[in-house]
A protein has these predicted regions:
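Short, surface-exposed coil-to-beta transition loops
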Residues: 73-75, 107-112
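Short, low-complexity N-terminal intrinsically disordered segments enriched in polar/charged residues
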Residues: 1-37
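Short beta-strand edge/turn micro-motifs at domain boundaries
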Residues: 88, 109-141
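Acidic/histidine-enriched, glycine/proline-rich intrinsically disordered or flexible terminal extensions
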Residues: 136-152
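Transmembrane beta-barrel outer-membrane domains
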Residues: 13, 69-71, 105-107
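Beta-strand elements of well-folded, non-transmembrane domains
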Residues: 95-99, 118
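A solvent-exposed, acidic/Ser-Thr-rich amphipathic alpha-helical stretch
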Residues: 31-95
Length: 152
């Protein structure tokens, strides 16, 4: 294992709390606040392309208005390693969404490839890349609905 330098327990817990907070906000109609979890130079990469912090803020405002969409994210297999002063993370995810047919089957399965940096004593996302492995078409369709301002 080249350059394998796992994080200490405290760092792991703090970053896992950051990840959980992001997903909680997405799943509980608080997407308009997710931009706060990024560094000033933070970016999100996914079905909508690359979004900086301000673009994420605008996206979140649209998504938060779509209160009839229900989603739940489940994560596991969290791998966190030091990379200089930042931490690199790989998080396996499973997303359910009621706009996916049938809603009891995952809308998307994949991984979040992330980088984290501590700013003013708090861990924040520097980069968050959403990489669907299964269900990529469903993820892209959902992103298009949010962009268009539609709910279902």
């Amino acid at each position: 294992m080249n350059n394998y330098c796992p994080v200490d327990t405290v760092t792991r817990v703090e970053i896992e709390q950051l990840i959980s907070e992001m997903l909680y906000r997405l799943d509980h109609n608080q997407a308009d606040t997710t931009w706060e979890l990024y560094t000033e130079d933070g970016v999100s990469v996914g079905p909508l392309g690359t979004m900086n912090r301000e673009q994420s803020k605008a996206w979140g405002a649209k998504r938060a208005k779509q209160t009839d969409i229900v989603s739940r994210h489940f994560i596991g297999g969290i791998r966190l390693i030091w990379d200089g002063d930042e931490v690199s993370g790989n998080v396996q995810y499973l997303t359910f969404r009621d706009t996916h047919e049938p809603p009891t089957q995952p809308a998307s399965v994949g991984e979040f490839r992330e980088r984290y940096r501590k700013v003013d004593g708090q861990w924040r996302f520097v980069r968050r890349e959403i990489v669907p492995i299964f269900g990529g078409n469903a993820a892209a369709a959902h992103a298009a609905r949010v962009t268009e301002g539609e709910s279902k």
